[in-house]
Amino acid sequence: MTIAPTTLLLFAATALAELVGCYLPYLWLRKGGSVWLLLPTALSLAVFVWLLSLHPEASGRVYAAYGGVYIASALLWLWWVDGVTPTRWDLLGAACCLLGMAVIMFSPRSA
């Protein structure tokens, strides 16, 4: 596997861990879920941090680029979990963010 697909898969897994880690407390606080949801929340957020640490790039660059993937993933979550269809403006915004992520992560670097 080349660096680009590996990076994208790692970003996608990271976004899923973060979204789950944020959604479970939402279920507890806003939807009457059990306080026990905080246990998988802690695990999910620990996995999120661990996944972010696996990238070979400088942390600031990884965090900046990951933001674009997170935005696109959050819109997929909006659609698949919340049942709300993203607007064309949502999709255009996510596409811009993903383009920014690609520029940040995959542009040539000096040695």
Curated annotation (Swiss-Prot):
Sorted alphabetically, which SUPFAM superfamilies does this protein's record hold? Multidrug resistance efflux transporter EmrE
Spell out where the chain crosses the membrane: 8-28, 32-52, 64-84, 91-111
Key words of the record = Cell inner membrane, Cell membrane, Membrane, Transmembrane, Transmembrane helix
Q: What is its main location?
A: membrane
Q: Does the keyword Metal-binding apply?
A: no
Q: Which GO terms describe its cellular component?
A: plasma membrane
Q: Where in the cell is it found?
A: Cell inner membrane
What kind of membrane protein is this, topologically? Multi-pass membrane protein
Regarding protein family, the annotation reads:
Belongs to the UPF0060 family.
Q: Write down what this protein is called.
A: UPF0060 membrane protein XAC3064
Species of provenance: Xanthomonas axonopodis pv. citri (strain 306)
Q: What is the lineage of its organism?
A: Bacteria, Pseudomonadati, Pseudomonadota, Gammaproteobacteria, Lysobacterales
